[in-house]
Amino acid sequence: WMKISITVGLVLVLLLSLFIKNKERAIKIGLCLSLCQQFILYSWYIGTGYHLATEGLPLFHCRICMLGLAFAYFAKKEKLVNYFAILGLICGSMACIVVDLDHFVFPHWTNFSYIVGHYLLVFNAFMLVRERSKIQVKDIISITLIMNLFILVADLSLKANYGFLMKLPSSLSFVPLTGVSVGVFISLLMILVLAILNKVLPYNKVLLEDKEEYIKA
């Protein structure tokens, strides 16, 4: 019942975002709440020392999106906002459908944080996706490869599995890959999915720098 309830909550979050009138204010509040949630979560990991190196760092794609969206939005890095909005919507939704809670009796803080954090990510990402600019495939490729290379180096150094770049989740256990090859597979899959969604999802404008490139071409 817990997993079903979380999925139903995901649908309600998406519906709620459709009826908000003051979008800019809602996005700012949502991003600030997301930062607070992340701060409390990392404070808990640091305070308890529970799997700090292998699970407590902001190296999962969802956590990167949570922090990346806030930084990019407030720093007015439009290209990164558009990238993390699409990635955050995908990752956040998947996390609410294929639920992977920590092994603590609910309601433990980590599990509560998991639910709230991903709801906020989906809310923020969905709000921003609807106002997004179209980005170029080369940017999707470069950002994804740089991000995943950094995660993969951390995984190898810490013997962790951030981003599932060393070992696939159980739902993809049928894929005969292990080690670094998993990271390559996930990276290619991410690039493909992000490129497709970037093309098919509606967008309001084109980045100014992209306009200039089109004019020069």
What is the role of each PLM region?
Residues I97-S142:
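A contiguous pocket-lining binding segment that forms or flanks enzyme active sites
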